[in-house]
């Protein structure tokens, strides 16, 4: 994958938490060679207490969700104004810093808490590494997103285009 992203000419961003500043940093991976892309992706998924921070250029980085769990900023900064935000829980992001952007926000159903058709509650979503439960969540997210979008996506874009 890294060779597909490196030098592709299309922006492809990853968000990492800078441990020195406590702020999010956004890396346009299309501007980096494949080995640096691996470092960036490793850093962007370094969940504290699960994976170690990744050092890049003398700075330690962690999971970007620590400082920006809905990384709209890099896309907004390059001119995008229409976003589909798919949340992993019921907590929404503060999108007020993007006043001229349009958002279609998607939230998962409570079914996301059930595991393997056994009717039992799953462990905390991010830290549940059970492959079966991950597959269940992926399929549930795909199904619910397609169901929602089939009835709303056309309206979302039509309404905005008419303004």
Residue ranges, per PLM feature:
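Patatin-like phospholipase
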Residues: 1-163
């Amino acid at each position: 994958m890294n060779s597909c992203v490196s030098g592709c000419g299309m922006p492809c961003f990853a968000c990492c938490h800078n441990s020195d500043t406590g702020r999010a940093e956004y890396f346009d991976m299309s501007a980096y060679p494949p080995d640096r892309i691996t470092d960036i992706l490793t850093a962007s998924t370094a969940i504290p207490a699960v994976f170690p921070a990744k050092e890049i250029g003398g700075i330690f980085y962690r999971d970007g969700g620590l400082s920006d769990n809905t990384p709209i900023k890099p896309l907004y900064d390059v001119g995008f104004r229409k976003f589909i935000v798919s949340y992993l829980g019921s907590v929404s992001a503060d999108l007020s810093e993007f006043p001229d952007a349009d958002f279609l926000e998607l939230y998962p159903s409570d079914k996301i808490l059930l595991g393997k058709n056994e009717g039992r509650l799953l462990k905390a979503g991010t830290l549940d590494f059970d492959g079966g439960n991950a597959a269940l969540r992926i399929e549930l997210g795909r199904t619910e997103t397609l169901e929602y979008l089939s009835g709303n996506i056309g309206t979302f874009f039509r309404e905005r285009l008419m303004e």
